[in-house]
Amino acid sequence: MAGCCLSAEEKESQRINAEIEKQLRRDKRDARRELKLLLLGTGESGKSTFIKQMRIIHGSGYTDEDRKGFTKLVYQNIFTSMQSMIRAMDTLRIQYTSEQNMENALVIREVEVDKVSSLERKHVEAIKKLWEDEGIQECYDRRREYQLSDSTKYYLSDIDRISNPGFIPTQQDVLRVRVPTTGIIEYPFDLENIIFRMVDVGGQRSERRKWIHCFENVTSIIFLVALSEYDQVLAECDNENRMEESKALFKTIITYPWFQNSSVILFLNKKDLLQEKIMYSHLIDYFPEFTGPKQDSQAARDFILKLYQDQNPDKEKVIYSHFTCATDTENIRFVFAAVKDTILQLNLREFNLV
């Protein structure tokens, strides 16, 4: 009855209040409809490549114009790789098989990589001759003894295509480009009316102090491990094994108080490189506790997975693991579909889906 006696102003005021209440409830519901996925792992484990795959699979992908924007970076990656090998030739005391390649090495050495925006014919010829040199090939085979990008062989084997005047990077070229992540990159994408906000933070040691800001309201941690790093040393510290560093970081992350309510998903990445490398670089030489057969990538994968699972002190906490190849779009499409289902299952109550 009292409602009949309300003035027009009071009715309007009530209507506005009801609208505000409704909007607040909507905002609260929308906040719940956003999932924050934190991508963690040491440098070069494949986090940025994974974000690129999300853009290809669940976002707008890369147009011709977008891919053109990577041309300069592809060229720079090629020079960086060749310069790394030229320096390593000196350090490892490997001889060039062709005298002329000593001169070619000088030509490439003088290039200021940051200023490269095109490929000159003299540089292309020098790079091709160097890459064909048996000394450089020996140096490439010994790459675990120095720092060299995983994409080196991919780009150098394709130098003819890349040096074409009308070159536009392919999707695979874009996925392979190496640019160290500095700062924090966020990539939100919409899946089934739920926003997945993926956050990629720099993996190098100097970048890790920036992570702290990302720790609030994390739904899931996706931790990437490069399987192929079992025999490599850190870029920042040349006598520390990369996998030992990654393992220690994983333990720190999963025992952080912030993450006790976050699910943990482990991507054992670069399975393709492990398969290649395990044929000549034996796991037991770096992890003496490995008792499996040599040249067996499945045994190596199982051992490395257990290494990481053993870092988990809380046996109640499930770690969801997947073997991945971040440069393979179909593999990531398949794996992320499983990850999405896991995350949604774990958050059903939040989304009122039960």
UniProtKB/Swiss-Prot annotation:
Cellular component GO terms, alphabetical: cytoplasm; heterotrimeric G-protein complex
Region (G2 motif): 173-181
GO biological process: action potential; adenylate cyclase-modulating G protein-coupled receptor signaling pathway; phospholipase C-activating dopamine receptor signaling pathway
Segments for region (G5 motif): 324-329
UniProt: Mg(2+) binding residues: S48, T181
G3 motif, as annotated region: 196-205
InterPro entries to which the protein is assigned, alphabetical: Gprotein_alpha_Q, Gprotein_alpha_su, GproteinA_insert, P-loop_NTPase
A GO MF label: metal ion binding
Residues of the G-alpha domain: 33-354
Pfam families linked: G-alpha (PF00503)
Region G4 motif, annotated ranges: 265-272
G1 motif, as annotated region: 36-49
Record key words, sorted: GTP-binding, Magnesium, Metal-binding, Nucleotide-binding, Transducer
Binding, GTP: 41-48, 175-181, 200-204, 269-272, 326
Keyword RNA-binding: no
SMART domains: G_alpha
Family: Belongs to the G-alpha family. G(q) subfamily.
Assembly: G proteins are composed of 3 units; alpha, beta and gamma. The alpha chain contains the guanine nucleotide binding site.
Function: Guanine nucleotide-binding proteins (G proteins) are involved as modulators or transducers in various transmembrane signaling systems. Acts as an activator of phospholipase C. Mediates responses to trypsin.
Protein name: Guanine nucleotide-binding protein subunit alpha-14
Organism of origin: Xenopus laevis (African clawed frog)
